[in-house]
């Protein structure tokens, strides 16, 4: 089996990649700026006996995301799982959101997953898509993250729509974790 994970070099994306590799999955790992972390993760994946290919792209440019998924499908033509984990999270209260922040949030958090999934389903006969959401979008708790919340709400609605539209060939799910990043001064256990 094979999986492709955006934002797979660090944190939750890395944990998903390592978990799947332990189970024998081959991994396509996306990163943007974290080459050292991506190479380290690749080495760890290969220690489990799984294949790992690295893919670099700025998901803030949706066409670059589509070009990347084309390369992923060359390496993994029968891709079983695509995980849209990469996201940007900018402080942006409604009164201060500018076009640049708004576009970046939607390009990375919504448009790139949209068009990558579209390319995936048009080039594979079956598979699984997992969109990483955020628990904050259910209750509107994070009012200082207007553009982020809107982009994740759009991704949540896309998840629901595609789960219906693409079944039974493709299973589409969303996972909405709570806070997962450790404090820069904290330990892994904290």
Range-by-range predicted roles:
Residues 85-90:
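Conserved NAD(P)H cofactor-binding loop of Rossmann-fold oxidoreductase domains
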Residues 130-167, 179-181:
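Catalytic loop of short-chain dehydrogenase/reductase
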Residues 9-10:
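Conserved glycine-rich cofactor-binding loop
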Residues 25-39:
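Conserved glycine-rich Rossmann-like NAD(P)H-binding loop of the short-chain dehydrogenase/reductase
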Residues 35, 56-67, 99:
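The beta1-alpha1 cofactor-binding region of Rossmann-like NAD(H)/NADP(H)-dependent oxidoreductases
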Residues 176-190:
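A glycine/serine/threonine-rich, flexible loop-to-helix segment
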Residues 93-94, 101-106:
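Substrate-binding pocket helix/loop in short-chain dehydrogenase/reductase
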